[in-house]
Amino acid sequence: MKTEAKKAVVASAAMSHTGSAEPATDSPPAAVRDLGRGTEPPVHVRGLVKRFGRFRALDHLDLEVEAGSVHGFLGPNGAGKSTTIRVLLGLYRPDEGSVSVLGSEPWRQAALINRQVSYVPGDVALWPALTGGQVLDALAGLRGSRDAEREAELMERFDLDPSKRVRTYSKGNRQKVALVAALAAPTSLLVLDEPTSGLDPLMERVFTEEVARACGEGRTVLLSSHILAEVQRLCSAVTIIKNGRVVEHGDLGTLRRLSRTRIELGAAADELGPVRQALEALGLDVVEDGGRLSLEVPPEQVPTVLSLAGEHRIQDVTCEPASLEDLFLRHYEEV
């Protein structure tokens, strides 16, 4: 898929090829700036079906990303994430369903829409004979707009040497070129597919800070990542897909509250016995280990469990809401 990845970076991520090189300016054309200003969300997908022969990669998938948010898009390899993203970029046409990106069907107005979409894939393929700076120049020329000051700031933050040729870059440095181009471009929507692949922990932190900044500036981010902690830090909402279908969607805080809470109670063994009996009478699975009781509690039973702990004067009580990893594994550990 490296050829397709390069096509996506050139045609979308940085940067739509309109058929002729245009001078880089400080702002996109007025027609582009007006995209996505209506009431419709920047990304609005309903009943999306995509088939490859007899294989149904996407099966009536729904996805909605609110303006100005960072939205996590999760699923293991083969779940349909990359196929969905390629439909959003106009590289694939859907077989069924409706898809709107910034108010338009991406395969019908690809050149116009892609000027407002920055895309970063997980495996960036660039022109090996060019320097990093020349790649950024080329991408800015194809887009027709550029913020040179912001670009320079990002190169410094990501510790990117633009004078070196792409063929000498590590995977992480190639990733940095795409991130600098995407974040510096005056676009309203960023589609990031495993964007921190190849980055070290320090650069991952810089990435997190820059995405938060982009969101603070009113830009919309669709983030697909296998690093669940990264998604949990950045995203206000998530969509989890499995076998081409959505299995979980919504505000991350709400999803965590609606999931089981992990509760631990600590006390002497003779004090825990009556509490354990009361908890098991509620139908809860209780694990006792080293003077502590551990259990996962549905949201509607959390007040009852805490009340029982109070009645039995258990003072060592810890509650831990479900993490994003818990939500994810709940669906993918099912047979």
Task: Show the residue positions of the predicted features.
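C-terminal coupling/interaction segments
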Residues: 2-14, 18-19, 23, 299-335
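Short acidic active-site motifs
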Residues: 109, 251, 304
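ABC transporter nucleotide-binding domain
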Residues: 207-296
